């Protein structure tokens, strides 16, 4: 029997990574059962405990993540030494930006063990607004590392077409045209557009649906330059009659955060970096109106009524030019919240079916192990 090994991303309690650690193994295992027959066993390769304090403004701890990944590599190496990795096994990296995939490929190739590997891409230096993109940019060592990791994966999973196109344009070269990266490799199954495995969100958010709403507008993002918190702070000054809260600054627990989503009328984004966006989906599940720019992944994910023109918040200067329009947009959504409830339901359906369901991910893995 084949085995599926989840090489996970370290869990931070306030991030979705802790939820994936709890839910993904069970969700994946349920899809690998046919009647009473187990098609494959799911095992996790965890790197142990990790610092809960992320590097300021970042998604994870830049030091701790390397300790975590090194521990994972040690376990993988020991598995090969003990003969525990077999033909037909599948390794799923829940964060594709993990250099240990190169050593995994090295061991499998040299030992003649026929495995397949999938990686879920979130961000990298190819995104100029991401932490790596801002601090490292197009440094040769980083771009070549990303190309190498991409090559190691048999399936590269992306949650949005926007992400695929950005990846291909940045990592394509003069001799490897962009259309090859995006179209040819997509047709061959090397690139797979699929929703993230977050079916649990709807159940998880149910207790917070139906809460009494108040005139609360949330900034649910990391406080980082690519999320443009200064625009949100200025909006708060323009609309003093409403309550504006930057969630990360409150030190919320996950439950506190979900309660805030349940009570809020609006979730606001002026992001210049987003390859999926989870918080606005969580908000929509509890009838909180998303206000998002018509750019990035929002462009393909959002229905028209919840997107505003991208130029309004491309940067702070453009925001100042269009501040009156943004202020009126926020005021309308707060004052007429109930009018938008049917549209919120429509938005939830789009997001749930196409972007926050792991069905295509599971289907791909199932096919790779022969079912």
Where do the protein language model's features map onto the residues?
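Donor nucleotide-sugar binding/catalytic pocket of nucleotide-sugar-dependent glycosyltransferases
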Residues: 151-205
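Short hydrophobic beta-strand element within catalytic cores of glycosyltransferases
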Residues: 289-292, 299
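Active-site proximal beta-strand in glycosyltransferases
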Residues: 90-96, 108-131
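Membrane-proximal helix-turn-helix segments that form the acceptor-binding/catalytic region
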Residues: 135-156
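A charged, aromatic-enriched C-terminal amphipathic alpha-helix characteristic of glycosyltransferases
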Residues: 313-371
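N-terminal pre-catalytic "stem/leader" segment of glycosyltransferase-like enzymes
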Residues: 1-103, 371
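Aromatic "clamp/platform" in nucleotide-sugar-dependent glycosyltransferases that forms part
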Residues: 271-272
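Conserved donor-binding/catalytic core segment of Leloir-type glycosyltransferases
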Residues: 198-227, 233-237
């Amino acid at each position: 029997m084949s085995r599926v090994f989840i090489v996970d991303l370290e869990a931070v309690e306030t991030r979705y990574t802790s939820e994936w650690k709890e839910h993904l193994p069970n969700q994946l295992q349920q899809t690998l059962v046919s009647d009473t027959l187990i098609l494959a066993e799911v095992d996790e390769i965890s790197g142990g405990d990790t610092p809960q304090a992320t590097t300021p403004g970042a998604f994870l701890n830049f030091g701790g993540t390397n300790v975590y990944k090194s521990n994972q590599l040690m376990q993988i190496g020991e598995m090969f030494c003990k003969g525990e990795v077999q033909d037909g096994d599948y390794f799923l990296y829940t964060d594709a930006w993990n250099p240990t995939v190169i050593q995994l490929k090295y061991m499998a190739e040299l030992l003649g063990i026929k495995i397949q590997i999938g990686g879920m891409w979130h961000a990298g230096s190819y995104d100029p607004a991401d932490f790596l993109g801002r601090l490292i940019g197009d440094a040769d060592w980083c771009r070549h590392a990303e190309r190498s990791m991409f090559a190691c994966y048999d399936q590269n999973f992306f949650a949005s077409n926007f992400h695929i196109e950005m990846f291909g344009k940045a990592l394509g070269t003069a001799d490897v045209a962009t259309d090859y990266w995006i179209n040819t490799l997509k047709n061959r199954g090397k690139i797979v557009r699929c929703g993230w495995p977050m079916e649990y969100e709807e159940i998880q958010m149910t207790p917070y649906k139906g809460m009494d709403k108040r005139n609360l507008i949330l900034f649910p993002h990391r406080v980082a330059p690519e999320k443009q918190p200064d625009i949100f702070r200025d909006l708060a000054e323009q609309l003093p009659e409403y309550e504006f809260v930057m969630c990360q600054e409150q030190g919320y627990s996950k439950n506190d955060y979900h309660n805030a989503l349940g009570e809020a009328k609006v979730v606001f984004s002026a992001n210049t970096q987003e390859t999926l966006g989870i918080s606005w989906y969580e908000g929509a599940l509890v009838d909180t109106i998303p206000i998002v720019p018509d750019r990035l992944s929002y462009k393909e994910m959002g229905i028209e009524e919840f997107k505003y023109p991208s130029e309004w918040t491309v940067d702070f200067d453009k925001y100042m030019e269009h501040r009156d329009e943004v202020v009126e947009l926020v005021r309308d959504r707060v004052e007429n919240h109930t009018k938008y409830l049917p549209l919120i339901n429509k938005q939830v359906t789009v997001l749930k079916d196409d972007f926050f369901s792991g069905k295509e991910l599971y289907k791909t893995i199932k096919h790779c192990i022969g079912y």
